[in-house]
Amino acid sequence: MLGLDRNPNMLELANSACGSVASQIGYGNVSFRRAEIDQLAEDLDGQPLLADGCIDVVLSNCVLNLVQPSRRGQLLQEIRRVTAPGGRLAISDIICDKPVPLELQQDPDLWSGCISGAWLEAEFTSAFEQLGFRKVALVDRQENPWQVHAGIEFRSANLTAELPCC
């Protein structure tokens, strides 16, 4: 089990709890590395990180919306590259019903609040389908908006998908 974060403070916190978390979940192979989610071939220290097809389950909790739209293509390609045949995705993130305008995208408070980078709902699912994932579904989609800005509804949703094994 490998956790990734680019923030050294978060990594320090994660590593301080690593032993107790590993014993609670019953796995001894828990580690954390400093990396960018859209550059998984090596970590931020220049060390090799993830080979092609080496991850059985990709879990992400409110991270994809923090990636700039200009880097989303690379992000998606990296998720696809590291997912093993037969692998699965479980991604919880923020989606919206209308495109986020530039003025909201440029607001640092809304970026840190997971609003500015929200994925358009239809694009969120289709992006993974276009990569070859199957059974792509939004599950546990929040019916009522979490927040509304400029008439745009923002809500949480969980996406699940599978990569065919053959």
Residue ranges and their predicted role:
Residues V58-L59:
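Hydrophobic beta-strand segment of the Class I
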Residues C62, E78-R80, F128:
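Class I S-adenosylmethionine-dependent transferase superfamily signal
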Residues D38-Q39, L64, I94-P99, Q142-P145:
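Short "lid" loop at the C-terminus of a central beta-strand within the Rossmann-like core
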Residues L131-C166:
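C-terminal lobe and adjacent flexible extensions of AdoMet/dcAdoMet transferase-like proteins
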Residues R72-R88:
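A short glycine-rich, Lys/Arg-flanked "PGG" loop and its adjoining helix->strand segment in the class I
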Residues M1-Q47:
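Class I SAM-dependent methyltransferase SAM/SAH-binding core
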Residues S116-G132:
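Short alpha-helix
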